Swiss-Prot record:
Cell location: Secreted
InterPro entries: Pyrokinin_CS
GO biological process assignments: neuropeptide signaling pathway
UniProt similarity note: Belongs to the pyrokinin family.
Function of the protein: Myoactive.
Record-given protein name: CAPA-Pyrokinin
This protein's record includes keyword Ligase: no
Leucine amide modification, residue list: 16
GO molecular function, one term: neuropeptide hormone activity
Entry keyword set: Amidation, Neuropeptide, Secreted
Top-rank lineage group of the source organism: Eukaryota
Gene Ontology cellular component terms for the protein in this record: extracellular region
Organism, as annotated: Pachyphasma brandbergense
């Protein structure tokens, strides 16, 4: 969503 990293699919999604 508003993350942009390589973490979980909650707030640190696929660079979205």
């Amino acid at each position: 969503n508003s993350g942009g990293g390589e973490g979980s699919g909650m707030w640190f999604g696929p660079r979205l």
